[in-house]
UniProtKB/Swiss-Prot annotation:
GO terms for molecular function: DNA (cytosine-5-)-methyltransferase activity; DNA binding. Keywords: DNA-binding, Methyltransferase, Restriction system, S-adenosyl-L-methionine, Transferase. InterPro entries: C5-MTase, C5_DNA_meth_AS, C5_MeTfrase, C5_meth_CS, SAM-dependent_MTases_sf. Its EC number is 2.1.1.37. A methylase, recognizes the double-stranded sequence 5'-RGCGCY-3', methylates C-? on both strands, and protects the DNA from cleavage by the HaeII endonuclease. The keyword DNA-binding applies. Belongs to the class I-like SAM-binding methyltransferase superfamily. C5-methyltransferase family. The keyword Mitochondrion does not apply. SUPFAM superfamilies: S-adenosyl-L-methionine-dependent methyltransferases. It comes from Haemophilus aegyptius. This is Type II methyltransferase M.HaeII. It catalyses: a 2'-deoxycytidine in DNA + S-adenosyl-L-methionine = a 5-methyl-2'-deoxycytidine in DNA + S-adenosyl-L-homocysteine + H(+).
Length: 318
């Protein structure tokens, strides 16, 4: 199998990289500005990502086959208003665009929040898609749910895949089941006391439950204060309160549990404070979803390579 070189932009703690390394890809560059994510990335991959992508020239980035980026969704205030290239300047997508233009990798994978497709009445996504097309890429996109790829977390994200050649590509199909929470959650008796809610909070949560409660379950409190108990987790969130997700109505998720809900292996080391683990886990990607997409992308690239090789062989026989 051909070894493809990747770069990991807005890398977080390396979830996208993990998904592609499962297929033998070699990462040659990474960028992440958050110091805690950098620290966790370094302890697990043996290299510290470069800092702010705005301080890095595309010419300084190594040649690569696949660009990977879980880029932040910033408001495209003038997106879709016919202002040409300036309509993406000042947003972090501009950096991706500049690197694709300069380095022309064979393929890319971008990940973002589901609402990217509807932001500014769809203009934001239209600008992104048009820019990628103008760079010569055939672009595919789809919203996928982590719950459909083996993890007990309802997390819908848009995945944008592009190829420099007009390659056939299909997004992976859902596997139709997810792991039981009992395989993700730790036993309460090994969880430190400071993770448990006060009696008052527990009573308040319990009084808000109106339906039968499955066990084990993760209790989710929405913005209106309504509480639901589910056999899976709602999406891990950077902005959620410490009690946004509660295990069986009695305690907060631990750091390892949050990483498991994103599909990271137990060997993935945590070396940052709990408050920062919540942030990097909420900002991260679901590794099994990335792994499934990576497999489909690698398959498309390999098929194209085989066709080129076969064409060369046939031409030599003529």
């Amino acid at each position: 199998m051909k070894e493809y070189k990747t770069i990991d932009l807005f890398a977080g703690i390396g979830g996208i990289r993990l998904g592609f390394e499962a297929f033998g890809c070699k990462n040659v560059f990474s960028s992440e500005w958050d110091k805690y994510a950098q620290s966790m990335y370094e302890v697990n991959f043996g290299e510290k990502p470069f800092g702010d992508i705005n301080d890095i020239s595309p010419s300084d980035i190594p040649d690569h086959d696949i660009l990977l980026a879980g880029f932040p969704c910033q408001p495209f205030s003038i997106a879709g208003k016919g202002l040409g290239f300036a309509d993406t300047r000042g947003t972090l997508f501009f950096n991706i665009e500049a690197i694709l233009k300069a380095k022309k990798p064979k393929a890319f994978l971008l990940e973002n929040v589901k609402r990217l497709t509807t932001h500014d009445n769809g203009n934001t996504f239209k600008v992104i898609n048009d820019k990628l097309n103008k760079l010569g890429y055939t672009v595919y996109h789809k919203v996928l749910n982590t719950l459909d790829f083996g993890l007990p977390q309802k997390r819908e994200r848009i995945y944008i895949v592009g190829f420099l050649d007009k390659l056939h590509f299909e997004f992976p199909k859902p596997i139709g089941k997810y792991e039981e929470l009992s395989n993700i959650l730790e036993s309460d008796d090994v969880v430190p006391n400071n993770y448990f809610l006060s009696d008052e909070l527990k009573r308040k949560r319990l009084s808000s439950i109106t339906k039968d409660v499955p066990y084990p379950s993760i209790w989710h409190e929405n913005i209106s204060g309504n509480v639901s108990a589910l056999p899976y987790s709602c999406a891990l969130s950077v902005g959620g309160s410490y009690n946004y997700l509660v295990v069986n109505g009695v305690r907060r998720l631990t750091g390892p549990e949050m990483l498991r809900l994103q599909g990271f292996p137990d060997t993935f080391e945590i070396n940052i404070p709990y408050s920062q683990v919540r942030k990097v886990a909420g900002n991260s990607v679901s590794v099994p979803v990335i792994r499934a997409i990576a497999g489909s992308m690698i398959n498309s690239l390999n098929m194209a390579t085989r066709k080129i090789y076969q064409a060369i062989q046939l031409s030599l026989l003529d």
